[in-house]
Amino acid sequence: MMRRRAFLRGAAGLAYGLAGRRPAGAQPPSAIEDELVVQTPVSAFIVEAMLKEFAAYAKERWQVTLKTRAQRAGTPVSYERIIAWKGQPEADIFWGGEPALFQSLAEQKLLTRLETPAETWDAIPGSIGAPKAIPLKDPGRQWVGTALEVYGIAYNPRLLKRLGVPEPRDWDDVLHPKLKGSVAQCTPYRSSSSHATYEVILQSRGEAEGWEWLKRLAANTGAFVAASRDVPAVVAKGEYAVGFGVPSYFVFEEKLAGFDIKFLAPKRAFVTPEPFAILAGARRPRAAREFLGFLLSERGQRLFMERGLFPVMPRYKVHGPPGSTVELAVQLTGGIRSFFEPPVTNVYDDEVARARFREVNERFKRDIESSWSGGKGR
């Protein structure tokens, strides 16, 4: 499918991060390092496109041939890896996932203060959502959001029709008795999208009712796949009818590949700002800082929109020509053009999630995974 460039509405584009000619006689900008390593759970569909575009920009601005590398792993796995590095990281950046884990790393002094210009920093609100606020940046400047996306339900409409199950309208619909063995999900200890969605269920229903709900979900689950990216893949292929706790842009990627797959953003779904942090002890801090500047520039925000994510600044809304991939992303998410209008309904409490992160994972292993029978009553 051919992709067409998006058109942004809103204020003029941010100058920071965009290429331009230097005035005659001006000194060239300080060069960046020639390598950049990113630790991330974000899909290669997003990461590789961003790194490729940033490398081209580095060549334009600094005449640097930048070598980039993404070390991909789920957010919980990446988090534990960063702790194990003990301030001598094998990457420069941690990008993507639940803000709670970034805040925890900041408290352990494993992140470094961001030097983002005030114009850019102030354009990003401190939080989004009500009655509980989802933080979009750290007041101490240890991390900042880069783009918004929602975690929801992926489903295969043809397979649902064959099973005699109506298309889902909210979370409870994944518990339909005819879906036994037909749901795919990732474990919360491997995926932050799954973990955050577990927290949405627990915090909206209370622990006792929430865990009973999650046990019923497990009874319908036919597969706990290795990574959250695999959830929409098996749904798109028709191996499973429904995917739980799925980032919207994963579904968008499958849609662009031509699969008949749909996405639902249920009420009270979690919206992540795809946090970005520079690791303490990073060997390439200048390249890391400039990559962040690029992501938060108009050029970077446009790239996010072309790949099914949403701007982290209210000044931008997702708009594109009819039939463009940008408009397809709007259609996929039920007409959303900005997560700032109307306001997001959110029950996820970041502090609660951070305080019991390991507790939720351990209880899942003990109460659900240990007795799971593949959703088929075996």
Task: Walk through the language-model features, giving the residues of each.
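Short loop->beta-strand "edge-of-pocket" segments that line small-molecule binding or catalytic clefts
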Residues: V37, D172-S192, V200-L202
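Early extracytoplasmic/lumenal segment of secretory-pathway proteins
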Residues: P28-S104, P232
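A structural signal for short loop-to-beta-strand junctions that line the ligand-binding cleft
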Residues: P89-F94, T112-I153, D172
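Conserved C-terminal helix/tail region of periplasmic/extracytoplasmic solute-binding proteins
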Residues: R337-R378
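Ligand-binding "clamshell"
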Residues: L105-L114, P139, E253-A265
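Ligand-binding pocket segment of bilobal, Venus flytrap-like solute-binding proteins
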Residues: E199-A265
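Mature extracytoplasmic/periplasmic domains
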Residues: L279-T345
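N-terminal export signals
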Residues: A6-A26
